[in-house]
Curated annotation (Swiss-Prot):
It holds the Pfam family Proteasome. It comes from the Archaea. The keyword Flavoprotein does not apply. It catalyses: Cleavage of peptide bonds with very broad specificity. One of its GO terms (cellular component) is cytoplasm. InterPro entries: Ntn_hydrolases_N, Pept_T1A_Psome_bsu_arc, Pept_T1A_subB, Proteasome_sua/b, Proteasome_suB-type. The 20S proteasome core is composed of 14 alpha and 14 beta subunits that assemble into four stacked heptameric rings, resulting in a barrel-shaped structure. The two inner rings, each composed of seven catalytic beta subunits, are sandwiched by two outer rings, each composed of seven alpha subunits. The catalytic chamber with the active sites is on the inside of the barrel. Has a gated structure, the ends of the cylinder being occluded by the N-termini of the alpha-subunits. Is capped at one or both ends by the proteasome regulatory ATPase, PAN. This is Proteasome subunit beta 1. The keyword rRNA-binding does not apply.
Amino acid sequence: MSRIHNDPKVLLTGTTTVGVVTKEGVVLATDRRVTAGYYIAHRKGRKIWKIDNHAAATMSGAVADVQMILNELTHLAMNYRITHQAPVPIKTLANYASVVMFYSRPMIYIAHMIIGGVDNEEGPVLYAVDWYGSFTREERFMSTGSGSPTAFGVLEDGYRDDMSLDDAVKLATRAVRAAMLHDPGSGEGVDVITITKEAGYREVQA
């Protein structure tokens, strides 16, 4: 276990995930390539996880670790909806993931997630949660994974505060595709979803 703590390279993930928030809703986009080091383990990996009709998350890190945490969030969302007759706040999901990851120390989960959605408290919102349990609200956009440096450049250049949801879809797709051109850990196509108050979770053609 000390090797994981002492060598940051072990924590690098071969993927690109992007989240963009607009006044209309949120957009999540990812590539499809699943890697294990320099080995391409899968070419059609699904890296967007539907938590509820109003919430979803991107997956970056060790697949089993991320899946375990997102299963927990899915159960939390279901139980919250049954108990309160309302959708769980996105901040509650991010905070719960943060607590799970923080208290797993020293055996940390290798997971980095963008959790996004639309709720009654904050409207369209994005949170990022890393493997140490830190979580932050992202006011405009976020990217994780080995392709994120390239994706951030595209996002910084193209984001506008007044952009439409359709433009955000195009921007997120462009950011992931740019990362795929420069990052060997990313590739095989782009998956995109949107979440709005009116339509909820919806898969979009990239």
